[in-house]
C-alpha cells in the first residue's frame, strides 16, 4: 500500500504529459480512423484505437516512412 500514492502520481503525470507529434499530426486519446496513402477511403471504426499521434483529418499516412501527407502527394496521384 505504500506504493499506491506513487503509482497514482505516475499515472497522473503520464496522462497529462504533453505529447510531441510530427508535422501534420495531432494527439488523440481516442483515435478512430487514419487514412493510409494508396488505400481507397475506408469506413472508420466506432470504437477508440490506441492513444497516439495520428494524421490530421485531411492527411494520409505514407508508407513506408510514416509521414502524414496531402492526398495529392499519394502515389496514385
Curated annotation (Swiss-Prot):
The keyword Signal applies. One of its GO terms (molecular function) is serine-type endopeptidase inhibitor activity. It is found in: Secreted. One of its GO terms (cellular component) is extracellular region. Residues 21-74 form the TIL domain. The record marks 46-47 as: Reactive bond. Defends the organism against the host's proteinases. This is Serine protease inhibitor 3. It comes from Anisakis simplex. The lineage of its organism: Eukaryota, Metazoa, Ecdysozoa, Nematoda, Chromadorea.
